[in-house]
From Swiss-Prot:
Pathway: Protein biosynthesis; polypeptide chain elongation. It is found in: Cytoplasm. The lineage of its organism: Bacteria, Pseudomonadati, Pseudomonadota, Alphaproteobacteria, Acetobacterales. Disulfide bonds: none annotated. Involved in peptide bond synthesis. Stimulates efficient translation and peptide-bond synthesis on native or reconstituted 70S ribosomes in vitro. Probably functions indirectly by altering the affinity of the ribosome for aminoacyl-tRNA, thus increasing their reactivity as acceptors for peptidyl transferase. This is Elongation factor P. Keywords: Cytoplasm, Elongation factor, Protein biosynthesis. Belongs to the elongation factor P family. One of its GO terms (molecular function) is translation elongation factor activity.
Length: 187
């Protein structure tokens, strides 16, 4: 389906130069002189190579339609994630590199959504938030109450996050999977 370049959004899959690309970032740039253009950072679905492309906002690009399918995460097998279809119980091997750094947030039996283009996986979406345990947290520095102070902490999955001073090791917190930020104490 053809669409104007200025309607491209992160997460969409497009076809350009005979190859499929997933859009990582997009930014509309309006210079002081001349017409606006869109700067797009995208990754080749076959090779994983990243590139930047510029189009005028009036240019058209071929957007590929994606189909969403729900899966349950089972386990990691080398460089692949083993996901199970909850309806048919069939297993699917999907490259872990599609998920990127967010692979650290995968938990057993977690429900994930996979975007497919003509049967090929192009993106994996995790739940917006996950609950994890703090395994180590730096002590609070006294007298830092004038500004909103946060301290570094390490989660059970190895990811480091900034948490409020009242959070201690052994507590469970809710973390946003999109940007690895603290949300609240787990209830």
């Amino acid at each position: 389906m053809k669409q104007q370049a200025n309607l491209i959004r992160a997460g969409q899959v497009i076809e350009h130069d005979g190859r499929r690309w997933t859009v990582l970032k997009q930014q509309i740039i309006t210079p002081g002189k001349g017409g606006a253009f869109i700067q797009v950072e995208m990754r080749d679905l076959k090779t994983g190579n990243k590139t930047n492309e510029r189009w005028r906002t009036a240019d058209t690009v071929e957007r590929l339609m994606t189909e969403e399918k729900d899966y349950t995460y089972s386990y990691t097998d080398g460089d692949n994630l083993v996901l199970m279809d909850p309806e048919t119980f069939e297993q699917a091997l999907i490259p872990a590199e599609i998920l990127g750094d967010a692979v650290a947030f995968l938990q057993d039996n977690m429900q994930v959504t996979v975007d497919l283009v003509e049967g090929d996986p192009v993106a994996i979406h995790l739940p917006a938030q996950v609950t994890l345990e703090i395994v180590e947290a730096d002590p609070v520095v006294k007298g830092q109450t004038a500004s909103s102070s946060y301290k570094p902490a390490k989660l059970s999955n190895g990811v480091r996050v900034m948490v409020p001073p009242f959070i201690e090791a052994g507590e469970r917190i809710v973390v946003r999977t999109e940007d690895s930020t603290y949300v609240e104490r787990a209830k």
